[in-house]
Amino acid sequence: MDNRSIHIEPKKSLGQNFLIDLNIAQKATHLLEVGPDDIIIEIGPGKGVLTQYLADYHNEIYAIEIDKRLSDLLIMQFPNKYYPNIHIINEDFIKFDFSQITNSQNLAVIGNLPYYLTSSILFKLFDNYNFVKNAVVMVQKEVANRLLSSTDTKLYGILPIALSFYGKITTSFNVPAYCFYPQPNVHSKVLSVSFYRADDKVPHSKEIMNMVKLIFQQRRKKLSNALESYLYSCGIDFKVFYDNLMQNQQYNILEYFDK
């Protein structure tokens, strides 16, 4: 039974903007790289527009929805009798533990991300890079442009730095605001992210990211003597580091960690 026509009022508190364009949904799901043994994680399936296309893969699918109204609707739409591979989980994705999934080393993640939680969700994926193989995420166009920005632009910041440690964007396409209900005031973009495997990931990325977060929290304020000394020992000027974090500087820091 198709329950997508059932009206459920979107919750502003959850940042709900339901994707209603089936062509966009199909195009996004086709970007997901799924092997025969991979497990699919869908973030915030809403009314199941993406889920219906994911079902064609016949892989195990975990659709994680925080809104119980929607998770109940999805259970009716994808009953276990006909969709034994689709598991509807009423839970906050931010709190979801990937390790509870059997064979969770090869996860393909997809989702239309709430704008206000985009950074938190992306950092959760970065922190769990060892589980995630690839991800297709729909985000606010402004956030996408930041992720796609180069080091010599004002958009460059902590998100593209983090992405450079854990993976890279391989494909992207624009999504107009009218493809959603309710229609947001901004446009969106779909990004396909390929995550590095353990051997390809930058060493000490967790330690470096902790330091980068501290630096961006400080902005251009004077840092503590300890952090200034830390950067100096890496041969890095703080202002240059903040404005233009280049790959060779990252490896200067790696040498510091390897001492």
What is the role of each PLM region?
Residues 1-214, 218, 236:
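Catalytic cores of RNA-modifying enzymes
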Residues 214-259:
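C-terminal lobe and adjacent flexible extensions of AdoMet/dcAdoMet transferase-like proteins
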